[in-house]
Amino acid sequence: MNTPESLKHTKWECKYHIVWIPKYRKKSLYKELRQYLGEMLKDLASQKECRILEGHLMSDHVHILISIPPKYSVSQVVGFIKGKSAISIARTYTGRRKNFTGQSFWARGYYVSTVGRDEETVRNYIKHQEEEDKRIDQLDLF
């Protein structure tokens, strides 16, 4: 098991596997946007004192293994990351500067699972998710 992190009066080890999708599960996370999002997600997480330990962006969903301090709820962090990244994507890739209301890049909701002793299993799952999806797609052809 890893060494717990600490706050002033707390030792903690809170890790979560989180998955979310673009609106309508559109396959929209490609090349330049994928790279841009990867850096942005790490930066946004650090603004909330979180660390992305593992992550993978598929064309139609995002997987992250994230460490979140107990002073923040998972929903606060996910809402912050999804909200700020959607605004940044709109500004950078669609040229919108203001009046962003009414549009969303990400679908509502997300999947979350706590990670404990199975951290290595979750890390491998996230790393190899793309190969697994391709393998399943090939099986579906027959």
Write out the residue ranges for each language-model feature.
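Basic nucleic-acid-binding interfaces
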Residues: M1-F142
